[in-house]
Amino acid sequence: MVVLALHVALYLPGCRSLKDRRRLVRPIVEGARARFRVSAADLGGADRWHRAELGFAVVSGSHAHARDVIDEVERFVWSFPEIEVLETGRTWSEGP
């Protein structure tokens, strides 16, 4: 079993309030959950309306499958024109 986690730091240039931030972040998190069947969460940064950190994770029996799913999730995040991706990072974990 392998777990692959993706961390994404975003800049949200059009946000003027927490409500604006949620309006931009929610479709990304919920869309990734629905389309790719991954765990997805807003990891914080709610005190800074123009920034967001998102986390995504997939559990799989194969490295290749996990990598393919997370590649799709990353492309999905990049497809939102109203955000800027500042940084991404991946973490692998293997279980028994």
List where the protein language model places each region.
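C-terminal structural segments of small proteins and small subunits
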Residues: 60-96
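N-terminal first-folded block
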Residues: 1-39, 76
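A short linear hydrophobic-aromatic micro-motif
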Residues: 37-44, 86-87
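Short, charge-patterned binding micro-sites
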Residues: 41-62, 94
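Residue-level signal for beta-strand positions within conserved beta-sheet cores that form or flank
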Residues: 36, 52, 84
